[in-house]
């Protein structure tokens, strides 16, 4: 339960074919909690297993995305204690999208700070939208902590090496404009409109052929790190079933008839 009694630490809502996951601890700048991570893991499972869900959006309540670990709460129990006493729970790590990539597109809608764990979660999303006042950073080294959400591995693969090392080793924060320049995010929008833009993008994807979208994303996932020649194998294997589907007939037929296609995921 959120500390202010405003409900669970993360909210899950389905709008049409889109599942919206909202981090809901605004009184703590949406700092991570065990409850929040558990709800996120359940939401990712729901996205993967429910054929009616075609896209997912991750956002935060109260003008904050996520400020990472709750350092104030660390006074009660130092971060390292869970590794010593056996209370560390690895089942919650997939909530951070570390070692867990969804089978459907995940869009981040960022307002305000996305610091430490906030930027770590961001790296597991596919399309990223941020309000112009958003801030990003990996601050763990400042407090002699380690970015356990995977940034020491992922960030250098997603943005230029020297920028990633700068952020990881100095702990400096960057603006939304800088994040877009470096390729960490794709869209900068007026403050307060990130979710609207994310919903617009999700609806565009939802109107596309879901078999094609999911096959494309599967290829992207499977071929990360592969040599190009090796990657063409899964590329072909994932593409052929799409062409053999009924939806592959419906798409061109709808184009010819100048109407919206009615995809059945068959």
Swiss-Prot record:
Sequence ranges of Basic and acidic residues compositional bias: 247-260
**A GO biological-process term:** cholesterol catabolic process
Phenotype upon gene inactivation: Not required for growth on rich medium.
Question: Where does the source fall among the domains of life?
Answer: Bacteria
Record field: catalytic activity: (22E)-3-oxochola-4,22-dien-24-oyl-CoA + H2O = (22R)-hydroxy-3-oxo-chol-4-ene-24-oyl-CoA
- Positions of the UniProt region annotated as Disordered: 247-266
Q: Which UniProt keywords apply?
A: Cholesterol metabolism, Lipid metabolism, Lyase, Steroid metabolism, Sterol metabolism
Single GO MF descriptor: lyase activity
EC number, UniProt record? 4.2.1.-
Record InterPro entries: ClpP/crotonase-like_dom_sf, Enoyl-CoA_hydra/iso, Enoyl-CoA_hydra_C
- Keyword Lipid metabolism listed? The answer is yes
Which pathway is recorded for this entry?
Answer: Steroid metabolism; cholesterol degradation
Keyword Lyase among record annotations: yes
- Described purpose of this protein according to its UniProt entry: Degradation of the cholesterol side chain involves 3 multistep beta-oxidation cycles, this may be involved in the second cycle. Hydrates 3-OCDO-CoA ((22E)-3-oxo-chol-4,22-dien-24-oyl-CoA) to make 22-HOCO-CoA (22-hydroxy-3-oxo-cholest-4-en-24-oyl-CoA). Not active on (E)-3-OCDS-CoA ((E)-3-oxocholest- 4,24-dien-26-oyl-CoA) or 3-OPDC-CoA (3-oxo-4,17-pregnadiene-20-carboxyl-CoA). Hydrates the same substrate as ChsH3 (AC I7GCU8), but the 2 enzymes make different stereoisomers of the product.
What protein family is recorded?
Belongs to the enoyl-CoA hydratase/isomerase family.
Name of the molecule in the record: Enoyl-CoA hydratase EchA19
Organism, per UniProt?
A: Mycolicibacterium smegmatis (strain ATCC 700084 / mc(2)155) (Mycobacterium smegmatis)
């Amino acid at each position: 339960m959120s500390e202010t009694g405003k409900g669970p630490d993360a909210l899950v809502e389905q709008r049409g074919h889109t599942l919206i996951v909202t981090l809901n601890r605004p009184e703590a700048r949406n700092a991570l909690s065990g409850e929040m991570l558990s709800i996120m893991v359940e939401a990712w499972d729901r996205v993967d297993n429910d054929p009616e869900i075609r896209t997912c959006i991750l956002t935060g309540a109260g003008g904050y995305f996520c400020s990472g670990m709750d350092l104030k709460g660390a006074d009660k129990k130092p971060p390292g204690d869970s590794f010593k006493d056996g209370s560390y729970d690895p089942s919650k790590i997939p909530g951070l999208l570390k070692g867990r990539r969804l089978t459907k597109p995940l869009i981040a809608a960022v307002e305000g700070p996305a610091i430490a764990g906030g930027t770590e979660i961001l790296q597991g999303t596919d399309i990223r939208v941020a309000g112009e006042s958003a801030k990003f950073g990996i601050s763990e080294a400042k407090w002699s902590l380690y970015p356990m959400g995977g940034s020491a591995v992922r960030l250098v693969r997603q943005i230029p090496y020297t920028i990633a090392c700068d952020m990881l080793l100095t702990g400096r924060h960057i603006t939304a404009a800088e994040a877009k320049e470096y390729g960490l995010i794709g869209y900068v929008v007026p403050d307060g409109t990130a979710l609207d833009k994310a919903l617009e993008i999700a609806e565009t994807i939802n109107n596309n052929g879901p078999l094609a979208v999911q096959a494309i994303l599967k290829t992207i996932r499977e071929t990360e790190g592969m040599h190009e020649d090796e990657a063409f194998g899964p590329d072909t294997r994932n593409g052929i079933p799409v062409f053999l589907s009924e939806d592959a007939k419906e798409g061109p037929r709808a184009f010819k008839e100048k109407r919206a296609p009615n995809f059945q995921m068959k």
